[in-house]
């Protein structure tokens, strides 16, 4: 008798995606981050739902409703900190996942890659709007500064900003709509993630060597379900360590002060996972130029398939490209550090050099390194 998972219309889809899926036999732990991102999304939706039951999106009560969640709701503090630190875990997995894609040449699956870029933008937008909701000082001023960037758009900029604000400043209308968008976006992300998987399963997974693995495939279950479960346990352990021992390690103390439009914090900065982009934005003196650089810092990923000049797909056997890749990683760490520093000498200069280097490595040095490697290998 045929197994029900192979004939039932619904189970059949799950079977082809999670059980009988032919998977390369040599994929490493770097391929775990896709499933870890799925787990992060599930944790965020689950904790977010319970937070939304107690949260009020009104400027008068938003801050005190978050205080109420932490003090009066049963395990409210745990749900709140799991949600806040869950966002950090989400971005750690996200950046490692993108880094893996760049290193092993996964961007050659252009549909999967482009949906991934859309997912990255959607997650960033969701995280930004979520940071506004507690209505602390950094929430308010972060929202003011970032939404104000749209005023750099010629002709329609000012009208666009006021339209997003729902008034002449960040106020009740802004908070209400941000809450609505923050609630709906994770479900859009889930739909996009399904599309991401759909396109991935059209081509099959890449592998560390970058060569086709059709002759050497193994079923996803039990081999990779076990491997993913280990990743799940490690992620949950790390999240619990962060949440239970140092819940405010990655947050900003300013956000424990209620939003006050009359008092500007000394250093306005976003959450740590946006600092690299914020540093690029700040390093350009022109407002419109800064906004364009900010968008391009992520959108540059979309042109990666066109910048691939190597005859090999993966960087596994390309030492010069590996040096370029790790220089890029170090550069991003420098940008993250600079984004959290005040706008003064020498941080401004370091930020400008690191920003130029970021674009130069991706646009010039990496394609050039690939061409040199081709030449050395006489390809």
Swiss-Prot record:
GO terms for biological process: mitochondrial electron transport, ubiquinol to cytochrome c. Keywords: Electron transport, Heme, Iron, Membrane, Metal-binding, Mitochondrion, Mitochondrion inner membrane, Respiratory chain, Transmembrane, Transmembrane helix, Transport, Ubiquinone. A ubiquinone binds at residue 201. Heme b b562 binds at residues 83, 182. The keyword Nucleotide-binding does not apply. Coiled coil: none annotated. It comes from the Eukaryota. The chain crosses the membrane at residues 33-53, 77-98, 113-133, 178-198, 226-246, 288-308, 320-340, 347-367. Gene3D superfamilies: Cytochrome Bc1 Complex, Chain C. Heme b b566 binds at residues 97, 196. The keyword Secreted does not apply. Heme 1 (or BL or b562) is low-potential and absorbs at about 562 nm, and heme 2 (or BH or b566) is high-potential and absorbs at about 566 nm. PANTHER family: CYTOCHROME B. Belongs to the cytochrome b family. The cytochrome bc1 complex contains 11 subunits: 3 respiratory subunits (MT-CYB, CYC1 and UQCRFS1), 2 core proteins (UQCRC1 and UQCRC2) and 6 low-molecular weight proteins (UQCRH/QCR6, UQCRB/QCR7, UQCRQ/QCR8, UQCR10/QCR9, UQCR11/QCR10 and a cleavage product of UQCRFS1). This cytochrome bc1 complex then forms a dimer. This is Cytochrome b.
């Amino acid at each position: 008798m045929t197994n029900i998972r192979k004939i039932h219309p619904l189970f059949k889809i799950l079977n082809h995606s999670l059980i009988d899926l032919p998977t390369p036999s040599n994929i490493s732990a770097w391929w775990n981050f896709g499933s870890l991102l799925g787990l992060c999304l599930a944790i965020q939706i689950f904790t977010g739902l319970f937070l939304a039951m107690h949260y009020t999106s009104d400027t008068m009560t938003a801050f005190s409703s978050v205080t109420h969640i932490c003090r009066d709701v049963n395990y409210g503090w745990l749900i709140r900190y799991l949600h806040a630190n869950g966002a950090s875990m989400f971005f750690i997995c996200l950046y490692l996942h993108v880094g893996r894609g760049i290193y092993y040449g996964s961007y050659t699956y252009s549909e999967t890659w482009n949906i991934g870029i859309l997912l990255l933008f959607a997650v960033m937008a969701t995280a930004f709007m979520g940071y506004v909701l507690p209505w602390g000082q950094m929430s308010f001023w972060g929202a003011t500064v970032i939404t104000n960037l749209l005023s750099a758009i010629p002709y329609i900029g000012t009208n666009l900003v006021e339209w997003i604000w729902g008034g002449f400043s960040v106020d009740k209308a802004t908070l209400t709509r941000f809450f609505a968008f923050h609630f709906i976006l994770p479900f859009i992300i889930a739909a996009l993630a399904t599309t991401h998987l759909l396109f991935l399963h059209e081509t099959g997974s890449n592998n560390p060597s970058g060569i086709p693995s059709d002759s050497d495939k193994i079923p996803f279950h039990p081999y990779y379900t076990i491997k993913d479960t280990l990743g799940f346990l490690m992620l949950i352990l790390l999240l619990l360590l962060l949440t239970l021992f140092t819940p405010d390690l990655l947050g900003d103390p300013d956000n424990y002060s209620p939003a006050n439009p009359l008092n500007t914090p000394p250093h306005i900065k976003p959450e740590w996972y946006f600092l690299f982009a914020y540093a690029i934005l700040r390093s350009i003196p022109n407002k419109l130029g800064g906004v364009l650089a900010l968008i391009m810092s992520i959108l540059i990923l979309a042109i990666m398939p066109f910048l691939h000049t190597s005859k090999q797909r993966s960087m596994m056997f390309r030492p010069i490209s590996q040096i370029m890749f790790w220089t890029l990683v170090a550069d991003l760490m420098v940008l993250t550090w600079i984004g959290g520093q005040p706008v003064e000498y020498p941080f401004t200069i370091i930020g400008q050099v690191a920003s130029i280097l970021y674009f130069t490595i991706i646009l010039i040095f990496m394609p050039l390194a690939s061409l040199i490697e081709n030449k050395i290998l006489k390809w």
